[in-house]
Structure formats: structure tokens, C-alpha cells
Amino acid sequence: MIVKIEGPIETFAKWKAMVHGNSEKIKKYGMTFLYAGTEKTNETKITTVIRFDTMEGLEDFKADDELHKERAAAGVDLANSVSTPMGDDLLEQYKG
């Protein structure tokens, strides 16, 4: 299951530090960040594309209130973040 999450953040550095500080939870939930970065012209808007190994991992991530508090403390605007499940038919790291 791949999910795209987009939304406002304070700074990428704070967001990235929060992610690194939660590496055990990322492993626990079976998360792999395929992409995480801000828009070139707007450093306060982040896009992440995350692969979850299982639907249970995604559900556990969504239910982790402690993690969401840490995300908010790191400057993630949770109220204005949008999560979009992506289709299973995809190209990944295709180089032609």
C-alpha cells in the first residue's frame, strides 16, 4: 500500500529530525519513504510518498496518537495535511 501525504510544515529540518527520531516506529509500521521533500518554490509544503508493507501497518500509523503529537510538535500542520492512497498499478524507479 502506497500513500501520498501532502501538507504544510514549519521546516524540513524539523520534520526530518522527527522522522529520524522515530526510526523504530517506522520499522514497526513497515514504512519505507519512497520520497519526502518540499516544493522547490515553497519550503513549507511537504510531499511524502510512503510504502507500507501491510494494511495493518498503515492502520497502526494512523492510530498512533503519540506519534501524531510528535509530528505536530515538529511543525506538521495535521489539520491541513491530506493523505491519498495510491493505486497498485505503478512504475517505480523506471529508467527506460
Residue ranges and their predicted role:
Residues I2-P8, Y35-D64:
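Short, well-ordered beta-strand segments in beta-rich or mixed alpha/beta enzyme
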